[in-house]
């Protein structure tokens, strides 16, 4: 790309950025999540001023690296409105027996993982059908939501760079809070 073309592109982005920034964000689909006791909650009831949904599994190597970093982020910014939800995707599509019987198998693995790693993030579960509907086709898979449940950014996979970017995006969403009337 030539210097003029690059300059024109940069100028176009600069001029349109304020208009783009004011566009409403796409809402995250209305889903329900289950806690480790089998209680079901609408996701919208769990949102903070900024919410990170981290889809993970106990057997996922990159998840084992990313979750402690998200725990640190939660420890740092939780008092400022950040909520980090660890959403385990070990459940297969819910069968007729429902979540309760499947939880009996999965719960001990999750609890062992949490105790070994010191992770204290709230853990919720979704089943394989919900995972497919959401398009979570790899893990870890993180989604940053604003206080209204709008999708700010999606992070498929893990890298140190994506974690740094996530932190910056979270700070940006938290800084927007007064403009949104606070939450």
Task: Label each PLM-derived region with a short phrase.
Residues 92-104:
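Short, flexible/disordered intra-domain loops and linkers
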Residues 1-7:
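Bacterial N-terminal signal peptides that target proteins for export
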Residues 141-183:
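Thiol-/selenol-based redox modules, centered on thioredoxin-like
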Residues 55-72:
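Conserved redox-active cysteine motifs that mediate thiol-disulfide chemistry
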Residues 19-44:
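N-terminal "domain-start" segment that seeds a small globular fold
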Residues 7-17:
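Bacterial N-terminal signal peptides
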Residues 52-53, 84, 142:
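Hydrophobic beta-strand anchors of alpha/beta hydrolase catalytic cores
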Residues 102-141:
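Short, internal strand/loop/helix patches
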């Amino acid at each position: 790309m030539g210097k003029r073309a690059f300059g024109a592109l940069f100028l176009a982005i600069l001029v349109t950025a304020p208009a783009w920034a004011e566009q409403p964000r796409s809402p995250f689909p209305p889903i329900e999540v289950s806690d480790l006791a089998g209680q079901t909650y609408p996701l919208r009831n769990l949102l903070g001023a900024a919410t990170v949904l981290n889809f993970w599994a106990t057997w996922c190597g990159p998840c084992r690296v990313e979750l402690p970093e998200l725990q640190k982020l939660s420890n740092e910014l939780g008092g400022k409105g950040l909520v980090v939800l660890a959403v385990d995707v070990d459940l297969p599509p819910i069968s007729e027996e429902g979540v309760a019987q499947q939880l009996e198998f999965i719960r001990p693995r999750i609890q062992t993982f949490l105790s070994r790693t010191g992770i204290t993030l709230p853990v919720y579960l979704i089943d394989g059908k919900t995972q497919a509907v959401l398009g979570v086709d790899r893990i870890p898979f993180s989604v940053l939501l604003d206080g209204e449940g709008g999708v700010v950014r999606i992070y498929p996979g893990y890298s140190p760079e994506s974690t740094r970017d996530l932190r910056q995006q979270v700070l940006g969403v938290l800084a927007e809070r007064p403009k949104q009337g606070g939450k």
